[in-house]
Amino acid sequence: MKELSLKGRVFPSDLNHNGSVFGGWIMSKMDKASSIAVENIIRGKAVTVHVSEINFKQPIYNGDIFIINTEITKLGTSSITIDVDVLVINHITYEETEVTTAQFKFVSVDERGSSIPLESVLRPNLPEYIEKLLTK
């Protein structure tokens, strides 16, 4: 189930020398949105261990509104896979378009940074779709 994880406006300080948003800025927002999705289901630490290919379909400009939706699609022994979609709303036309998608993988870790089983850090009362992923 896709959920809104992050939404905001682009400001001049977010732009590269070409006048559009710096790609690394978008990736960092995607990582933050993914971490929010992860924190919704676990009570511990998790770290990003993999990001799939990211292809940008169009630039994002100053004043545009970005929307990042996430969906947890797979739960492993210690890993969580999240699909991430970035949409942009043009601040002039208010037209919404998809900018990029990617898949992020997080691993739950202990205080030393070693992976630990998800079962040991899952929050109570998980959404039904997460419960279904646990039984796969």
Walk through the language-model features, giving the residues of each.
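Hydrophobic beta-strand-centered segment that forms part of the acyl-chain substrate-binding groove
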Residues: 1, 35-69, 73-75, 79-81, ...
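Hot-dog-fold acyl-thioester-processing enzymes
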Residues: 1-50, 107-136
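Short, well-ordered turn and helix-capping elements at secondary-structure junctions
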Residues: 10-14, 51-58, 88-90
